[in-house]
């Protein structure tokens, strides 16, 4: 799952996701996808910089976007039914907005947390030489890594894709579905470094 948002705030009092995309896989290959643009009744404005980076198109979202109440049941069904939920920086960002969406509809999100696999955390752990040990809790490991800072550790999706020589259209990143397609390729490189 990946969310494109108005800004980097981690809750709905200042931010919402205007695009939420999901890819279903067999562990290696894409089987299905959902790509939602969401229209919110909100006073939030996206900055010109954020519009440029994410290619946010307000008229497109207004014309093609769905109401949150129409997309949440599908998102919930996919996430609740998933064995794992893989995302790049999902521990540090996306899960907070997913949590807010679950809360908005009176649902609990906590059962999702043990399913989270964050490719950013995995890559950072490898680069910082803090490997995951099978005897430790994987969720706790990821939270420890996301909160460990080291200079010079490059783990953005673009950096990892290029480091792994992955063929991808990098100019289209920050479209959630395009990000997920690259993240699946990155995951297919990183997963062999783990013993889950």
Positions of predicted regions on the chain:
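Conserved non-catalytic scaffold segment of RNase H-like nuclease domains
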Residues: 1-111, 149-164, 174
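Generic detector of well-ordered alpha-helical packing
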Residues: 3-5, 119, 180
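A short acidic, often aromatic-flanked loop/helix-cap motif at beta-alpha or helix-coil junctions
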Residues: 42-44, 122-125, 176-177
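Active-site catalytic microenvironments for nucleophilic, acid-base chemistry
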Residues: 100-105, 125, 129, 163, ...
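Short alpha-helix plus adjacent loop in nuclease-associated cores
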Residues: 116-149
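Acidic two-metal-ion nuclease catalytic site recognized across multiple nuclease folds
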Residues: 138-151, 161-165, 177-196
